[in-house]
């Protein structure tokens, strides 16, 4: 007589038991069996499995949306950029067609000479350099004007160009007691080049016995004393520097 409520069959676990590998089965076949055993059941709560290509597709979609937004925002700026590039090309074409390199250089030299003459006239009309002594017109240079002119004068008054260059490259007066290279610190390359040209020009003129200075006596009202004014290329080059 059988007892009620007792199941004669043994209870089976809901967890799939690992399948035994048959003799002679290949590793690929075993991998397929494991995949079928793991993926055969349903996910709880009505969840569904995500396909492997879903995440890359979402990334591609977001990337396309960002590109569309960026293009929409940058379209006006791209138009301006293209317009400026086209205008720049047209200007270069006009310059190459109308102004060759020699013509451009000639115009630049002519404008530089006019600017130099303007400065000379301006300083003469404003401060009367021709009626000032050397010390007085040097004192009219203010701040950086006097600083740069002092280095220029150091080079041209040195016994030789190399000695003057060494003096400004090992300067102790500007930031005493430190020794600094003023050529590198204050970018004195224009002053060095002009001083070299000045010394070369003066040397050539002295070699041929040509005068480079014009001197005259200036009589001033007392208590100012009479002095000898000197006009030379040093003063003219000073205007170019300041």
Curated annotation (Swiss-Prot):
EC number: 2.4.1.-
GO MF terms held by the record: glycosyltransferase activity
Region (Disordered), start-end ranges: 1-56
Coiled-coil residues: none
Entry keyword set: Glycosyltransferase, Membrane, Transferase, Transmembrane, Transmembrane helix
Primary residence: membrane
Annotated Pfam families: Dpy19 (PF10034)
Compartment annotation: Membrane
Tissue/organ expression: Brain, heart, placenta and testis.
Superkingdom of origin: Eukaryota
InterPro entries: Dpy-19/Dpy-19-like (IPR018732)
Transmembrane segments: 103-123, 149-169, 190-210
EC supergroup of this enzyme: transferase
Gene Ontology CC entries for this record: membrane
Topology within the bilayer: Multi-pass membrane protein
Protein role: Probable C-mannosyltransferase that mediates C-mannosylation of tryptophan residues on target proteins.
Protein family (similarity comment): Belongs to the dpy-19 family.
PANTHER family membership: C-MANNOSYLTRANSFERASE DPY19L2-RELATED (PTHR31488:SF6), DPY-19-LIKE 1, LIKE (H. SAPIENS) (PTHR31488)
Misc remark: It has been suggested that DPY19L2P1 is an inactive pseudogene from which DPY19L2 has evolved by duplication. However, expressed transcript sequences derived from the DPY19L2P1 locus are known to exist.
Protein name: Putative C-mannosyltransferase DPY19L2P1
The organism of origin for this protein: Homo sapiens (Human)
Gene: DPY19L2P1
């Amino acid at each position: 007589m059988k007892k009620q409520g007792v199941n004669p069959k043994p209870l089976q676990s809901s967890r799939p038991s690992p399948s035994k590998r048959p003799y002679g089965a290949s590793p690929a076949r075993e991998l397929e069996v494991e995949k079928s055993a793991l993926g055969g059941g349903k996910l709880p709560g009505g969840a569904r499995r995500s396909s492997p290509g879903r995440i890359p597709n979402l990334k591609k979609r977001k990337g396309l949306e960002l590109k569309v937004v960026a293009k929409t925002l940058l379209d006006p700026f791209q138009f301006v950029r293209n317009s400026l590039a086209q205008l720049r090309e047209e200007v270069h074409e006009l310059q190459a067609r109308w102004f060759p390199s020699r013509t451009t250089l000639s115009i630049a030299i002519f404008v530089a000479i006019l600017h130099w003459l303007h400065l000379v006239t301006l300083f003469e009309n404003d401060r009367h350099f021709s009626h000032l002594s050397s010390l007085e017109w040097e004192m009219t240079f203010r701040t950086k004007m006097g600083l740069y002119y002092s280095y220029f004068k150091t080079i041209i008054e040195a016994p030789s160009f190399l000695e003057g260059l060494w003096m400004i490259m090992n300067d102790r007066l500007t930031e005493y007691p430190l020794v600094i290279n003023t050529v590198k610190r204050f970018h004195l390359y224009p002053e060095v080049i002009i001083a070299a040209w000045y010394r070369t020009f003066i040397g050539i003129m002295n070699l041929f016995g040509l005068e480079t200075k014009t001197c005259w006596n200036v009589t001033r009202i007392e208590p100012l004393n009479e002095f000898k004014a000197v006009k030379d290329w040093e003063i003219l080059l000073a205007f170019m520097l300041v």
